């Protein structure tokens, strides 16, 4: 069983590294990250310190999209190719199949993130390299969380075009509209919602939690207070729990959905 699961992981990794859309988006990410590093290298010392926050903004936009694109066809793609039944007939459980596909794609995503940040790191000024290296693990957490969401979308959708539409919609929702919705909530309630509630809702979104953690990294624990937001940040244990939930729950739910679908037939 372990040998079959390992073969599935390797197969997914090789297939995704040959996916032209993933390659294109990864190259775009690497190019944009390199452009940020080039700007930091050519700018004065004061402007060079903006390279890290600029890279965080870029990552919070591009990496979730790459991850959702990478995960959106994990299950539904097999269904449309009529190979899902063959895949589920292997001597591994439904959950193990989903986890193997998820892990293989997570490795491919790690390669894409590594290439993008590696390109930026290679041409970054020496003073900014430590900061950029500190972005690697949080960026991988962000990407894997959205990859998990993409895998769940793939298990729910019945057609690949539907899964792609859902993935793009979720990207807009998590990256753009979520924060706008919270801002609208503050406006509608005339500030009646407490800052603690808003902070909790922001950190419940993986993209928002990533931005908050990176703001703390660059500005220190008092960074939000300096912006007039005197709210308690989630503890390290709570942040780890939020990340673990976003990363682990969607693939598990996907495996359960496959098991339920198989049982109905």
Please name every model-derived segment.
Residues 64-71, 148-149, 178, 206, ...:
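Hydrophobic/aromatic residues in alpha-helical transmembrane segments
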Residues 1-26, 258-264:
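Aromatic- and glycine-rich beta-strand/loop motifs that create alpha-glucan
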Residues 35-38, 45, 52, 59, ...:
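Secretory targeting signals
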Residues 26, 101-102, 135, 139, ...:
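Residue-level recognition of transmembrane alpha-helices
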Residues 74-106:
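Helix-loop-helix units of permease transmembrane domains in multi-pass membrane transporters
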